[in-house]
Each structure stands twice: as C-alpha cells, then as structure tokens.
Design a protein with these regions (language model features):
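Single conserved hydrophobic/aromatic residue that forms the stacking wall/gate
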Residues: 1-7, 11-12
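Short, solvent-exposed loop/beta-turn-alpha elements that line the ligand-binding surface or hinge
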Residues: 8, 15-26, 71-75, 96-143, ...
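Stable alpha-helical elements in mature extracytoplasmic
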Residues: 8-9, 39-43, 47-50, 64, ...
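Ligand/substrate-recognition segments at binding pockets and active sites
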Residues: 13-87, 151, 178-179
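Extended amphipathic secondary-structure runs
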Residues: 31-37, 41, 144, 148-150, ...
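Sec-exported extracytoplasmic/periplasmic mature domains
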Residues: 48-56, 73-77, 85, 99-103, ...
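Short catalytic/ligand-binding loop motif for oxyanion handling, primarily in non-cytosolic enzymes
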Residues: 88-91, 183
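A short hydrophobic/aromatic micro-motif that marks alpha-helical segments and, especially, helix-coil
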Residues: 93, 116, 164-166
Length: 207
C-alpha cells in the first residue's frame, strides 16, 4: 500500500492528462506480476491490451509459482493477481483476507507504512468515527461481524467493510475463475450458486 500511496502522489505531481477519447498522456508505467499458468497469463495479456487502449503502459511479468509468491510477498510489483476460494457460503472468508494480521494480506493493508495512516471512517452502534487507521476501522468491523449473531447486523457491517476495502483502490475483483462456463445469450434463468452448483429448474430458451 505504501507503493500505492507513492504512485498516487506521482500521478498528482505529474498531472497526467486525458484527452477527449479517454487516452492518458504521462501516466506512470505499471508492471503486472502474475504466475505463468496459461489462464492467468491470458488475463494479463488482456489487461495489457485494455490498458494500452487508454495510453497506459502495462508490462506483464510472468513467473513460476514459487518465484511469483516470493515476489508478491516482497511487494515486488505495481499490480499483481491474487486468488482465493472460500470454503463456506459467506462473505467473511473473503473480507478476512485483508485484515491487518492476515497472512493473505499481500498488499499489506494496515501494516508497515500503512499502519499509521488514519484516513478511514467507521460507523458502529450508530456512531461514526473519522480519522481511523485500518486496524481501528476495517479490523474493528471484522471483529464485530465475527462476534455478532444478528444476520441483518452482520450484512450491514460486511457492506461497510467492503466499501472501506474498495475505497483503498488496492483490490479490484476481476472474475470468479473457479466457476467458469459459457452460456448462450438465448438461455435465461440459469442460476449459479456461490459454491459452484448450477440450478437449471428456471432455465429456458428465449429467441
């Protein structure tokens, strides 16, 4: 996250411009770090092409899995991929990834240079507190969620935690790659459950 803050300061300082076609000029070059599995490299190549349309140079670095994990843990990237598969039908396994002390927190939210950053707000028990650190906001929300038995309260707090996470700009969900399938646009009503089951009872063809 410290690198993200430095990158943001660079963008503000250099004042990159965007023309009428949405193409950037002067945007800092980015490196996308990924493992060398074919599917992940294909996504990286697509992102390289997509960013290029907007004038942003994105260099793809593909490494074998062991090297990739070590590079990611060391923060050797500007953008990297991260994946996770939950074992229960609940948002918490995913939200818990980004707790300050989580080993899966590869962007180091709430750690290092980011630990003392007090730029977040949190609302608990109807009271909003501003100028909170990641531990005082996100971690506090997770603790309350884990200790609550009230479904409505849990989901309200989980939405708040999700909003905090998205506001950092450190995480950008792409797709659910453990449950990929092709579906003709004429097929309607197909439901895919969060644990991978496909429900066909409401499926029908429209032409």
């Amino acid at each position: 996250i410290a690198q993200c803050l430095v990158g943001s300061e660079m963008c503000i300082r250099d004042r990159f411009t965007v023309n009428a076609q949405g193409v950037c000029a002067g945007f800092p070059e980015l490196t996308y770090l990924t493992s060398d599995a074919a599917g992940h490299v294909a996504i990286a190549d697509y992102l390289h092409s997509l960013y290029g349309r907007y004038g942003i140079a994105l260099t793809v670095t593909a490494q074998d899995m062991d090297t990739f994990l070590a590079s990611r843990a060391a923060g050797g990237y500007s953008v990297t991929r991260c994946s996770f598969s939950a074992d229960i039908d609940d948002p918490m396994p995913f939200l818990s990834l980004w707790a300050s002390g989580a080993g899966s927190n590869c962007v180091a939210l709430g750690r290092g240079a980011h630990a003392d950053y007090a730029g977040y707000s949190v609302t608990l028990d109807g009271r909003t507190k501003d100028n909170c650190t990641w531990a005082e906001s996100y971690d506090a929300l997770l603790y309350r969620i884990q200790s609550s038995g009230d479904t409505a309260e849990r989901y309200s707090l989980m939405h708040q935690a999700e909003t905090l996470l998205m506001q950092t700009g450190a995480v950008c969900p792409l797709y659910w790659y453990t449950d990929t399938y092709l579906c003709n646009t004429h097929v309607q009503g197909l439901l895919s459950g969060p644990l991978g089951a496909q429900y066909l009872m409401g499926a029908h063809v429209e032409k």
